[in-house]
Amino acid sequence: SVDKDRSTTLLFTNGWAVEEQAKELRRAGLDSVFVSIDAADPQQHDEFRGTPGLHQRALRGIQRALSLGYSTGFSATMTPEAWQAGELQRIIELAKGVGVHEVFVFDAMPTGRYKARTDLVDNHDWLEEMIQSAAPYNRDDRYPGVTFLAYMSSHRSVGCSCGTSYFYLSPYGDMMSCDFNHAKFGNVLEEPLWQIWDRLSTLPEFCQAKWGGCKIKDAESRKLQTVSDGDRSCHDRDDQPAMTN
């Protein structure tokens, strides 16, 4: 089960309601807030998200979180083409200006709106160059730390430990091994969280980390129903609209 004294709770969000809810969430025990930034340019970000004004609200929300003492960050998803266009560098500069503590970089996964991007499966060639590009920022105290899921899930770190040392909880209470996995293992509105977590973390495919990259981007792992549960977005529910974090 989860030891509340040895675990942390992170919120990854599009940032729409953070400014209004940050104080209440702090009282509830939330430790960290990460807002998704898809582009440093507000218009480009809002067009991608389909929500006018979202970029501005996300920045206001993260500034509110900073004022309340949260650990804060940007989460950015990079496709190979966005990386080549210099978007990561622009987002890092924005993060420096805002004053967040970290930029967490996800390499685009073949799920959600990218579920048709089969070119992202078993494609690691561009990731090392992107990871190494952050070294100057990480040596400069003026910048936030820049971390990469691709590094963490590699043989140089802990490997892909989704469902092993962490899980994702959807806005509707569904527990998944991570926010990119379609498969649901239970709902906290229907049974205790610890019970679902124990069931998930003792499955053979999740009882230990997988070295060498993310399960969702691995062709062999994706054959498992517990890793790639159909074609629906990982946020879709039969009784709820799809959401994008």
Placement of each model-derived feature along the sequence:
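Radical SAM enzyme [4Fe-4S]-AdoMet core and its adjacent flexible, acidic
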Residues: E24, A28, S36-D38, Q43, ...
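Flexible mid-to-C-terminal extensions adjoining Fe-S/redox cofactors in radical SAM and related proteins
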Residues: M175, D179-N245
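Short, small/polar residue-rich loop motifs at catalytic or cofactor-binding pockets
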Residues: C160-T164, H182
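Conserved SAM/AdoMet-binding glycine-rich loop
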Residues: S1-I37
